[in-house]
Curated annotation (Swiss-Prot):
Cytoplasmic face residues: 1-28
GO CC, alphabetical: plasma membrane; type II protein secretion system complex
Lineage: Bacteria, Pseudomonadati, Pseudomonadota, Gammaproteobacteria, Aeromonadales
Function: Involved in a type II secretion system (T2SS, formerly general secretion pathway, GSP) for the export of proteins.
Annotated PROSITE patterns: T2SP_C (PS01141)
Domain of life where this protein originates: Bacteria
Keywords for this protein: Cell inner membrane, Cell membrane, Membrane, Protein transport, Transmembrane, Transmembrane helix, Transport
Primary gene name: exeC
Location(s) in or outside the cell: Cell inner membrane
GO biological process: protein secretion by the type II secretion system
Name used for this protein in its record: Type II secretion system protein C
Length: 290
């Protein structure tokens, strides 16, 4: 298919057009139609030429044929499998690195006010104050405003990771250098305390002294102090002369809400006590395992 084909076609059309009688009014229209026809023929010719050249440039490829003894052609899908179209499965987390039992005492300006050490690390909680703000932290949490991460919680200390090394943050009042306690002992202790108190509520005074505080005849809270056995009081993150103002968000200064709070506490295994300490409010988490 070549250019002479287009010229012969146009010459034939012109020869035929000369034999057609044209009036004065139809002649301009005739030439307009003739030009449009010629333009269309030229465009068609060039498209055919381009198509032929593209087909000639494509390399020939043999058709895939199934080999004898097989029902269908075998395809190599290894390349597709390496694309990770649906993402990559996360590898199972490696066992946690052993915590340094002799980790040096931290220089971090933070105070460990309470711990809830559990045999299940996910349930362990550390109550830490830093820059005047006290919060509860679990394993893997970063202490607010620092790069220190909680590594493990024990009954009298917390191991934190700071600048790539383990450090020890002792419970306030405890002496650094004591043997590392076994995690999980506090679970059994809290469980036994709960059972004891349910059987004999009067035993609460062995662990906690509670006294109502009134100002001008108005209830403002309940003063909390350790009992004859102060260990549990300290481990819960309470401080002498803390004043409890709410339990689980129920205001203890309101008689109706205080009664509701007491009903909840009777069968609760955990609670959040809000205390007022030196003019600031702190939330103290208390867990009593069954």
């Amino acid at each position: 298919m070549t250019l002479p084909f287009r010229n012969d076609l146009l010459s034939s059309l012109l020869a035929r057009c000369k034999t057609v009688p044209l009036s004065r009014f139809s002649q301009p229209l005739f030439w307009l139609l003739l030009l449009l026809l010629a333009h269309q023929c030229a465009g068609l010719t060039w498209r055919l030429l381009d198509l032929g050249s593209q087909q000639a440039s494509q390399p020939w490829q043999p058709a895939m044929v199934a080999s004898q003894g097989q029902g269908s052609a075998r395809l190599d899908l290894s390349g597709i499998s390496r694309l990770s179209l649906f993402g990559k499965a996360k590898q199972q987390a490696q066992a946690a690195d052993a915590v340094a039992a002799d980790a040096p005492k931290t220089q971090l300006n933070a105070q460990l006010n309470g711990v809830l050490a559990s045999s299940d690390p996910a349930k362990s909680i550390a109550i830490i104050a830093h820059n005047g703000v006290q919060n509860s932290y679990g394993i893997g949490d970063f202490i607010d405003g620092t790069q220190a991460k909680i590594r493990q919680v024990f009954a009298d200390r917390v191991i934190i990771e700071r600048d790539g090394r383990d450090e020890t943050l002792m419970l306030d009042g405890e002496e650094y250098g004591k043997p590392l306690p076994k995690p999980g002992n506090q679970d059994d202790k809290l469980s036994s305390v709960r059972s004891e108190l349910l059987g004999n509520p009067g035993k609460i005074t062995d662990y906690l002294n509670i006294s109502p505080v009134r100002v001008d005849g108005r209830m403002v809270g309940y003063r909390l102090n350790p009992g004859s056995n102060p260990e549990l009081f300290n481990q819960l993150g309470l401080v002498a002369n803390d004043m409890a103002v709410s339990i689980n968000g129920l205001d203890l200064r309101d008689n109706a809400q205080a009664m509701q709070a007491m009903q909840q506490v009777a069968g609760a295994t955990e609670m959040t006590v809000t205390v007022e300490r030196q003019g600031q409010l702190y939330d103290v988490y208390v867990g009593l395992s069954e």
